[in-house]
């Protein structure tokens, strides 16, 4: 696969120079200008330039809406087909009949799948922020199921309210009936859907790099530009980060499917580079996406599930609480809120009638709730900053084009 598109390598290197009035600009000055432009864009954030950031965000939103409107206008047949299908689904949903029991069941499953796939996409794409939805949503969900399973001696939680709320079933389970596999099976759907979402979120770097390689155009994406610079200076790379990126690139390029599978299965921050590498070397789509899907939705998710389940198993949690209490001086005061939190969770699991009543709030749960709110707020702010910087990049590209034509 490394041979695909190799005739374009020298042409790609030649495109790093700009021709102006019959002469070529020094590549070092071009790189310096790109660096200054990048630093200028990075300063466009809400806490430094709030008015400009909000203005650019609004303008970028209008530009994106205009682009999507234009794309949809040129695909009128697809839009009409979509609305006809939507109208048929709405009619099926609201018309009374014997089919409603199946509609409700499909709706429940669809919303469950869409929720976790959406969180997986957000975790993978992140829009420049890396919103770690595993730490905020899936991890706590697996931990809650694990704690409840050991407390109830069962994973047959009543539905509803599960998965929105976990309470013990009326029939008591036998002591020691819970196994690692039973908890893994209970959270398999949520975890696999989340993993599928993360695999889908890895597609944009692949498509961007593939389109840039096939078209031969100068790419706008900074990560792709850094990737090309890394290939040009591969022999002189000295720092650890560059060597790690080169190792990932060589693994994917030479091993192919199993190299991509290895990168997707092992938690690492460099998988975006694998997507760019596969797109750049024109790896077939199903080779890339198939390996990514298997690695992220099956292998990696089982590794993460087992880690969370083992960490929050009953005896491990009890040992951690006891260890906290053994800290000299401050141990008992630190141990108390953890004990209160665990006791409150047990009460919620065993008292069905009190599940909806207000209970005293523990500072641990209060802290976690505020952490989630802060992460979501930061994610929203980062979207605003990212879109504002995208509009600033449009302005810089327009100015650079005008300079070249003078």
Swiss-Prot record:
- Locations listed in the record: Endoplasmic reticulum-Golgi intermediate compartment membrane; Cell membrane; Vacuole membrane; Endoplasmic reticulum membrane
> Under the GO molecular function aspect, what terms does this record hold?
phospholipid scramblase activity
Q: In which tissues is it expressed?
A: Highly expressed in intestine, kidney, ovary and placenta, moderately expressed in liver, lung, stomach, thymus, brain, and testis and slightly expressed in control thyroid and retina. Strongly expressed in pancreas (acinar cells) during acute pancreatitis.
Q: Where is this region: Disordered?
A: 1-37
Q: Where is this region: VTT domain?
A: 173-316
Membrane-spanning residues: 78-98, 110-130, 251-271, 274-294, 306-326, 364-384
Reaction catalysis annotation? a 1,2-diacyl-sn-glycero-3-phospho-L-serine(in) = a 1,2-diacyl-sn-glycero-3-phospho-L-serine(out); cholesterol(in) = cholesterol(out); a 1,2-diacyl-sn-glycero-3-phosphocholine(in) = a 1,2-diacyl-sn-glycero-3-phosphocholine(out); a 1,2-diacyl-sn-glycero-3-phosphoethanolamine(in) = a 1,2-diacyl-sn-glycero-3-phosphoethanolamine(out)
Modification sites for N-acetylalanine: 2
Report whether Translocase shows up as a keyword of the record: no
> What segments bear the compositional bias annotation Basic and acidic residues?
9-20
Cytoplasmic topology ranges? 2-77, 131-250, 295-305, 385-406
Keyword annotations for this protein, in alphabetical order, are:
Acetylation, Autophagy, Cell adhesion, Cell membrane, Endoplasmic reticulum, Lipid transport, Membrane, Transmembrane, Transmembrane helix, Transport, Vacuole
- Topological region Extracellular: 99-109, 272-273, 327-363
What membrane topology term does the record carry? Multi-pass membrane protein
Provide ranges: composition bias, Polar residues: 21-30
The UniProt comment on domains reads: The VTT domain was previously called the SNARE-assoc domain. As there is no evidence that this domain associates with SNARE proteins, it was renamed as VMP1, TMEM41, and TVP38 (VTT) domain.
Q: What does this protein do?
A: Phospholipid scramblase involved in lipid homeostasis and membrane dynamics processes. Has phospholipid scramblase activity toward cholesterol and phosphatidylserine, as well as phosphatidylethanolamine and phosphatidylcholine. Required for autophagosome formation: participates in early stages of autophagosome biogenesis at the endoplasmic reticulum (ER) membrane by reequilibrating the leaflets of the ER as lipids are extracted by ATG2 (ATG2A or ATG2B) to mediate autophagosome assembly. Regulates ATP2A2 activity to control ER-isolation membrane contacts for autophagosome formation.
Oligomer and partners: Interacts with BECN1. Interacts with TJP1. Interacts with TP53INP2. Interacts with TMEM41B. Interacts with ATP2A2, PLN and SLN; competes with PLN and SLN to prevent them from forming an inhibitory complex with ATP2A2. Interacts with ATG2A.
This chain's protein is named Vacuole membrane protein 1
Q: Which organism is it from?
A: Rattus norvegicus (Rat)
Gene field: Vmp1
């Amino acid at each position: 696969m490394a041979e695909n598109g190799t005739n374009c390598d020298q042409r790609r290197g030649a495109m790093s120079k700009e021709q102006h009035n019959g002469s070529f600009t020094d590549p070092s000055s071009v790189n310096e200008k790109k660096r200054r432009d990048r630093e200028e864009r990075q300063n466009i954030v809400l806490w430094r330039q709030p008015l400009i950031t909000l203005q650019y965000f609004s303008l970028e939103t209008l530009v994106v809406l205009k682009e999507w409107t234009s794309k949809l206008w040129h695909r009128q047949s697809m839009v009409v087909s979509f609305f006809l299908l939507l109208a048929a689904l709405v009619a099926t949903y609201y018309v009374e009949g014997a089919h409603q029991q199946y509609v409700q069941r499909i709706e429940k499953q669809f919303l469950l799948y869409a929720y976790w796939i959406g969180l997986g996409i957000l975790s993978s794409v992140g829009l420049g922020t890396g919103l770690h939805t595993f730490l905020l949503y899936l991890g706590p969900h697996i931990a809650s199921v694990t704690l409840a399973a050991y407390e109830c001696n069962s994973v047959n939680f009543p539905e509803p309210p599960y998965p929105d709320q976990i309470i013990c079933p009326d029939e008591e389970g036998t002591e020691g009936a819970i196994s690692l596999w039973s908890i893994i099976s209970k959270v398999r759907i949520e975890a696999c859907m989340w993993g599928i979402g993360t695999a889908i979120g890895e597609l944009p770097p692949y498509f961007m790099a593939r389109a840039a390689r096939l078209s031969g155009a100068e790419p706008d994406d900074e990560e792709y530009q850094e990737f090309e610079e890394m290939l040009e200076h591969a022999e002189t790379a000295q720092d650890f980060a560059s060597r790690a990126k080169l190792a990932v690139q060589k693994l994917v390029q030479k091993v192919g499917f199993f190299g991509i599978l290895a990168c997707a299965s092992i938690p690492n921050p460099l998988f975006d580079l694998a997507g760019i590498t596969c797109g750049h070397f024109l790896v077939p789509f199903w080779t890339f996406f198939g390996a990514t899907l298997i690695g992220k939705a099956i292998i990696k998710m089982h590794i993460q599930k087992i880690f969370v389940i083992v960490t929050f198993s009953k005896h491990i949690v009890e040992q951690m609480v006891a260890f906290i209490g053994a800290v000299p001086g401050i141990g008992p005061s630190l141990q108390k809120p953890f004990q209160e939190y665990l006791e409150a969770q047990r009460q919620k699991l065993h008292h069905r009638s009190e599940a909806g009543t207000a209970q005293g709030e523990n500072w641990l749960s209060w802290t976690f709730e505020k952490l989630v709110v802060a992460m979501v707020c930061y994610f929203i702010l980062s979207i605003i900053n990212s879109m504002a910087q995208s509009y600033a990049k449009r302005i810089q590209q327009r100015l650079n084009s005008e300079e070249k034509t003078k």
